[in-house]
């Protein structure tokens, strides 16, 4: 499970990442933008959006809705970090939803690999090493439970 320090770091970082709805939409678009910049092949999972770029995530209702949905899911994980069974249940639900869309554990690993850089950008350089390692651990739980 996650340590007390990791749980606190997740909660503290979430206050920055998801301060309000506008911030959540902006940060989710930035997160996916970085993923697609580093790993263009991951765009194949998003047939709703233009295959060449992901500006549509910020510009369209569908894009904003997906970003908000992803960040709401992350928020549920952060809100549940003190309940290990709930975190595992959420991880398994997320896995089922993504497996149905052809998203693999390797795709989750790619997201995990860019998350520290995303945190730096989204927090304006205020992400601590504790925050980065806590998110890495939480994303590790998602990967371990991806079937």
Curated annotation (Swiss-Prot):
Keywords (A to Z) from UniProt: Heme, Iron, Metal-binding, Muscle protein, Oxygen transport, Transport
SUPFAM superfamilies named in the record: Globin-like (SSF46458)
Keyword Metal-binding: yes
One GO cellular component term: hemoglobin complex
Subunit text: Homodimer.
Family recorded in the similarity comment: Belongs to the globin family.
Protein name: Globin
Other known facts: In contrast to the other dimeric myoglobins, N.mutabilis myoglobin is a highly cooperative oxygen binding molecule.
Molecular function terms from GO: heme binding; metal ion binding; oxygen binding; oxygen carrier activity
Protein source organism: Tritia mutabilis
Record keyword Iron present: yes
Domain (Globin) ranges: 1-147
Lineage of producing organism: Eukaryota, Metazoa, Spiralia, Lophotrochozoa, Mollusca
UniProt cross-references to Pfam families, sorted A to Z: Globin (PF00042)
Residues involved in heme b binding: 66, 98
InterPro entries (alphabetical): Erythrocruorin (IPR002336), Globin (IPR000971), Globin-like_sf (IPR009050), Globin/Proto (IPR012292), Mb-like_M (IPR044399)
């Amino acid at each position: 499970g996650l340590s007390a320090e990791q749980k606190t770091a997740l909660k503290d970082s979430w206050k920055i990442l998801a301060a309000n709805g506008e911030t959540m939409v902006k940060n989710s678009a930035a997160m996916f933008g970085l993923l697609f910049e580093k790993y263009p092949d991951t765009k194949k999972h998003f047939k709703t959006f233009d295959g060449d770029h992901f500006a549509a995530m910020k510009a369209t209702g569908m894009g904003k809705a997906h970003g908000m949905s992803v960040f709401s899911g992350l928020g549920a994980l952060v809100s549940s970090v003190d309940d290990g069974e709930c975190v595992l249940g959420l991880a398994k639900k997320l896995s089922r939803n993504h497996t149905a869309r052809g998203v693999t554990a390797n795709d989750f690993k790619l997201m995990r690999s860019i998350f520290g850089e995303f945190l730096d950008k989204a927090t304006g350089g205020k992400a601590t090493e504790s925050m980065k390692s806590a998110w890495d651990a939480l994303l590790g739980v998602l990967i371990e439970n991806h079937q």
